[in-house]
Amino acid sequence: MRYAELQVTTHFSFLRAASSAEELFATARLMGIEALGVVDRNSLAGIVRALEASRATGLRLVVGCRLDLQDGMSILVYPTDRAAYSRLTRLLTLGKGRGGKANCIIHFDDVALYAEGLIGILVPDLADEVCAVQLRKIAEVFGDRAYVSLCLRRRPNDQLQLHELTNLAVKHRVKTIVTNDVLFHEHGRRQLQDVVTCIRTGMTIDDVGFERERHADRYLKPPEEMARLFPAYPEALARTMEIVERCRFSLEELVYQYPEEALILGMTAQQSLQHYTWEGVRARYPEGLPTHVEKTIRHELALIETMKYAPYFLTVFSIVRYARSQGILCQGRGSAANSAVCYVLGITSIDPETNDLLFERFVSQERDEPPDIDVDFEHERREEVIQWIYKTYGHDKAALCSTVTRYRAKGAIRDVGKALDLPEDLIRTLSSGIWSWSETVGERQVRELGLNPDDRRLTLTLRLAQQLMGAPRNLSQHPGGFVLTHDRLDDLVPIEPATMADRQVIEWDKDDIEALKFLKVDVLALGMLTCMAKAFALISEHKHEDIDLATIPQEDPATYAMIRKADTLGTFQIESRAQMSMLPRMKPRTFYDLVIQVAIVRPGPIQGDMVHPYLRRREGKEKVEYPTPELEAVLHKTLGVPLFQESAMRVAMVCAGFTGGEADQLRKSMATFKFTGGVSRFKDKLVNGMIRNGYTKEFAEKTFSQLEGFGSYGFPESHAASFALIAYASNYIKCYFPDVFCAALLNSQPMGFYAPAQIVRDAREHGVEVRPICINRSRWDCMLEPIDGSGGHAVRLGMRLVRGLATADAARIVAARADEPFTSVDDMWRRSGVPVASLVELAEADAFLPSLSLERRDALWAIKALRDEPLPLFTAAADREARAIAEQEEPEVELRQMTDGQNVVEDYSHTGLTLREHPLRFMRDDLAKRRIVTCAQAMTAHDGQWLMAAGLVLVRQRPGSAKGVMFITIEDETGIANIVVWPKLFERSRRVVLGASMMAINGRIQREGEVVHLVAQQLFDLSADLSSLAERDGAFRPPTGRGDEFAHGSPGSADSRGKAPPGVRARDILVPDLHIDTLKIKSRNFQ
């Protein structure tokens, strides 16, 4: 018999189902089910994934949605045509607008207003009077499109319920239809279904009760089984196919229309684009346009006209022009940097005159996919650009894409463990043993953690957590991907308010809109642009030089000399340990060397085995040979090694006769070959084409395997060049203005790879004087102060580094001392009006010492005498005398001051850094007795020497391309050391590697040129020694840099559901009309 399952919930109903659309469609196809109706709850978030699963299996998708109404009524709705679909998306947008983030409030009256063209299936609970009222309503609204679901609930008298429900349906002239209310694709997912129910409801498996499914029957069943279960209702079974026939709407009917962007009255979008392009040519090439660049621009304009992309280019041009008019630094990157048109419009900075661009990497007629222009803005000012877009295009036509937050290993173990009621300390132990968000925990790791692998709940937790990994947890907003439309955006997709004010998000992510060929504009944030903007402002103010990204001197020898020494901490892109290790081997001397440097430390070139051949050829250890002049023309700049995606495309075009579009299809298939196997269809064409052009079969196959090896991670040359521009500029500032660079970098946190402690240490090593936070001299930001008699400048640390201090309180302090500095704690308190709690934060940061000579404990003792509301009698007297009076002053008390070690611990605890001695300086004698050398001694030791070094753990990295090798950076009072931990040692010492804040390493020095590593053989946790530094109960954990993948998550994969790491507390905002001085803030006791 023919049957379609029309009530299928995927895991995009977020913790209400346990299977993906891919699993459901694949299973349904094997069972002979003809179509699936996907009805996620109050959402279309997973419908595009269902469309792709439908395309992959050839099974029909019926687009639908389950509406859970406020009165308790539930209706399955399916649009029969395009107009009905738009009414559904508008209805969902209405409900989400009322409900706010992750909620949807819809009433039956709303459904009645939007019901035209929708098929409605009532999902009843019992055949009672409530059901009768609901049937009457649905019959009135939906007419002949009204149905009622017959579904086995596995409760007493199920068959009697079905019989009575059928009678009620006949009475109200509503047709019956059989559904199975599918929540998972196969019986084995039942336990996971119960667990996600527990997670959603916040209960454990022991007390969830009737919230869980009462039976294990919510899986897909073949048509024959459904006929056996509903023998008395053959018509209701047959009607499933009736609804499939009536619902002819497909998501592929959605026609995306980009906003019309003419900009110039009387001109079309294409004419406007051409006008601005040739206007930009005059600005970019004042001495005349080179012939080959003109040819490139005309080629691009013609292709843009053919593809009808002119409005898109004009939109990005408008956004960039607005940002520049507001003094906001921005730069385009990615494949868009292959466009000469983007360059002359000022969107990108890669000059086609000096760079060999490949436009087909960006826009290809054969590919027929929308272009993707990524533009980076200062991360502190990007919100101005976002709000301008909303204001310009309207909230009804502009919204951000969503991002799907999925379960990774840590989050899965945490949530499943709570659902199964594991003890919190056991969950914490399991989670702490995981390196990355995607790593699994097996029996071996369980034993290493000292746990019992035979414990049933523990074993079940690990198994179910493995099943949960990859499942969607919730939707969040994309970093900056805007979808803009000509007509109403909610005609295409539901829109919901974002958590942030004045933002809204569509329910689809970037992969969904790409599948439907929607255009998006990426308005991204880049911290280094904020840093550069602040650096330029400081240089102008204090050095009286006006420079910007465009006027920084190019190919500066001193800058490249600094880069070759790997003196790049804090700079852009080349500050990681892997990049620093490569710099002395690459020895960049030109801008193109820097482009290669940015791209070469990537998984693609490493997995394609291209790094070592390139380095050997660069060092003259291997001869560069080109079989033909054509190949030499393509690869001569990279010494015969195809390091970039454009290189692979040009090899295919020049050596195998591919067109530009075919070469881009090859690139894209290489990027997905691991998942689809699509690259194999190009192998014969590439190999045979190269053989026809005179290459040997062996060389052709080697070329293909090389391209295949790196294709999935290949880096576009244009993207590398865009990043190299900023990398060079940041290094130039560091080279010539190290004081400015330090201040700007600290003022732009959080960003980059390293914590403020390492940034300050590096600046001091470059001769920069760094001055402490001071209540009379520090502003919110770090500033430059003149050094008497030298003409130089020192960096004064700003109050932004004081943990817990509010921005508004800092502003009041600065304003209050404008006329004269504070003379005492009481004077500061009275004049600034900040709450006592803020004074405590400043005292704990030792901010009273520089100008008032008050040690921490003295300042805290003085603050303890203050009240947020002074006694009225004393206040009046003090105001009259314009000074503190004797009755307000505390008697002098001599306190025992903190030790140097205690002060260092307090510095780290309250500012994240110290200007005193390094913590290990206090431990050096003890370490020396154990024959532990300094980091400086270790890094200058000869090759092969065995030694033991120790230091604070700054960074732990385990790149996916490094085959499990761990790279650790440690620091002591003499500098840093780079540690290599092989996979076997990592597994043996996992708890030390992941848990130690201070570590000792016994190993052997490995020296290759200027690159030095300590290859670990044994690891020891010295965190207890570090904690004893302050002789206190709490463990002292110095802050790690943002590049530490264990403390801060794997790059790009942070688990957003985890608790925020300890650090700077949320700051408030200074609102002039908010009389914050009237708020009562309880002061804190210091004991």
Curated annotation (Swiss-Prot):
The keyword DNA-binding does not apply. Residues 1033-1064 are annotated as: Disordered. SUPFAM superfamilies: PHP domain-like. GO terms for cellular component: cytoplasm. It catalyses: DNA(n) + a 2'-deoxyribonucleoside 5'-triphosphate = DNA(n+1) + diphosphate. GO terms for molecular function: 3'-5' exonuclease activity; DNA-directed DNA polymerase activity; nucleic acid binding. It comes from the Bacteria. Its EC number is 2.7.7.7. It is found in: Cytoplasm. Keywords: Cytoplasm, DNA damage, DNA repair, DNA replication, DNA-directed DNA polymerase, Nucleotidyltransferase, Plasmid, Transferase. InterPro entries: DNA_pol3_alpha_NTPase_dom, DNA_pol3_finger, DnaE2, DnaE2/DnaE/PolC, DNAPol_HHH, NA-bd_OB_tRNA, PHP_dom, Pol/His_phosphatase_N. GO terms for biological process: DNA repair; DNA replication; SOS response. Pfam families: DNA_pol3_alpha, DNA_pol3_finger, HHH_6, PHP, tRNA_anti-codon. It is an enzyme of class 2 (transferase). The keyword Ribosomal protein does not apply. PANTHER family: DNA POLYMERASE III SUBUNIT ALPHA (PTHR32294), ERROR-PRONE DNA POLYMERASE (PTHR32294:SF4). HAMAP family: DNApol_error_prone. Belongs to the DNA polymerase type-C family. DnaE2 subfamily. DNA polymerase involved in damage-induced mutagenesis and translesion synthesis (TLS). It is not the major replicative DNA polymerase. This is Error-prone DNA polymerase 2. It comes from Rhizobium meliloti (strain 1021) (Ensifer meliloti).
